[in-house]
Amino acid sequence: MNKFLQIFLFQFMFFGYSQSESIKLNDQVDQLFKVWDTNNGPGLALAIIKDGAIVYKKAYGIANLEYDIPITPSSVFHIASVSKQFTVFSILLLEKQGKLSLDDDIRKYIPEVPDFGKKITLQHLASHTSGLRDQWNLLSMAGWRFDDVITKEHILKLVSKQKELNFSPGDEFMYCNTGFTLLAEV
């Protein structure tokens, strides 16, 4: 069965979950995710939360294939671009509450962003059309490695030193993590 279909079915199954069905739930979850419980591919850590309490947690598969290190329920994962949807959702909630506008200039919230003579809006940042250089490209050129600890202060410093844009805001699309670091700050 397709893994994405399995996840969908799992979500569908969970909506009808009650506390008295915990053993049945455990068996159903194990059955659904056993495809990831191997030593030859990455896996996952899973927690099911109901009414603010963890009702199920388990790990499946391997965290580090090279060293055969298993995933545990407390394994930490790099969330990466999965966070972008939550960042934009948060910005849209703030807009709905009247606390900001997608047309606001990022410099209104983060004055460290240089004035490039062109307004960079929150919309530009959220849609990868800001023209800013990507933070990971800049970091790698500066000798940083992907597994180095990188703080928002590091990113803001990189952005503040940027001399020009790759293109005028809104004119082109270029995937840019920098925009989401800035949106997260807002």
Regions from the PLM with identified roles:
Residues 1-24:
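Bacterial Sec-dependent N-terminal signal peptides
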Residues 4, 16, 56-57, 146-150:
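Short acidic/polar alpha-helix capping motifs at helix-coil junctions
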Residues 8-10, 36-38, 69, 115:
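Generic marker of residues within folded, mature protein domains
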Residues 62-177, 181:
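Active-site-proximal loop and beta-strand segments within enzyme catalytic domains
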